[in-house]
């Protein structure tokens, strides 16, 4: 029983398991980062468009006040 316990804790096994997890998770994490980046860029474009509309409206408001 003791030898099995030591085998599970061997650094070589944990290292290979770690590499295995990295090879699985690496592409998934990269894909998630790409999706998040695309979503953020989309939201940024929306915010920029809204700010442009606000500037246009405030100019119109200023013109209206001037009349």
From Swiss-Prot:
Other notes: The P gene has two overlapping open reading frames. One encodes the P protein and the other the C'/C proteins.
For this chain, the family text in UniProt reads: Belongs to the rhabdoviruses C protein family.
Q: What does this protein do?
A: Seems to stimulates transcription by the viral polymerase. May play a role in viral pathogenesis or transmission by insects vectors.
Stated name of the protein: Protein C'
Tell me what organism the protein belongs to.
Answer: Vesicular stomatitis Indiana virus (strain Glasgow) (VSIV)
Which taxonomic lineage is given here?
Answer: Viruses, Riboviria, Orthornavirae, Negarnaviricota, Haploviricotina
